[in-house]
């Protein structure tokens, strides 16, 4: 596998703010991936960053453990680690211009283990009749986009969509994991793919993505913009929530236009400082994990993100080393990323306003770059 010409070799001196970053925080995220790959290697992305080329970096990372080092590495040591094993390469958007970053987070909401007068909106587990679909079992006539379907005696068919499910299509199957008080809260948990649940019985629980109904995602921001309700430039999670609060009678009308429905599984909250286990099978690190297009990029790849207009994280231009540890259906293209802001309302305030141009510097293993003496 050869490295895509989309990667343009640079030096670390070309990266704005590189020497000022806290590389130890990025190393902690990379360190978690280094142990997971012993169980299951990451799949190679189509742009040619071969997983096997990470072997030396992962092996060295695994020699450092919290048991013998705290912090795992200091900032200087972590910076030297990344400079020793990787070469920075600038990767542009398909248009040839800068890339785009948005933000995501793990909501935390109050929930009940049982339905009550107040808690009436369920989060559902994966139904038994929801099956994975690919070209090996897709029947003629089924939308080729669909990766999930409903198994019937006559074969796979398109699964129930959001409107059908919320009108009761699965109401008798006992799939309810927990009950929420607000349908809009539930929808944004679907968008984020995970949540912490402050249960009324005193427990702190977590749900994470298990599967989906399979239809295309249609964001409410786009719908409200096309209806003339919110100018496109003003669409944020906060503005969408405010519109729903002002128009409670139209919530179903808007949300049911997004036919995609998410199913969840229960998970433990093992470390309150970390997010949920994501697509790369490691817990997300606030401010250091990034979701990328997994068809193009290889999980575990470090990305240095230069987004000078983004100041929501710490009131300074966003220039940070991130580790590719998640993906998302809206995250497509070589220079497109979703930054994990953390858990809870404060993280949501950050994530909801992130939509900024950014330069993406993929740090690729030196073995993949000819003449890698930069």
Where are these regions (language model features)?
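Secretory/export targeting leaders with adjacent low-complexity proregions
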Residues: 5-268
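C-terminal soluble interaction/assembly domains
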Residues: 5-8, 19, 25, 271-374
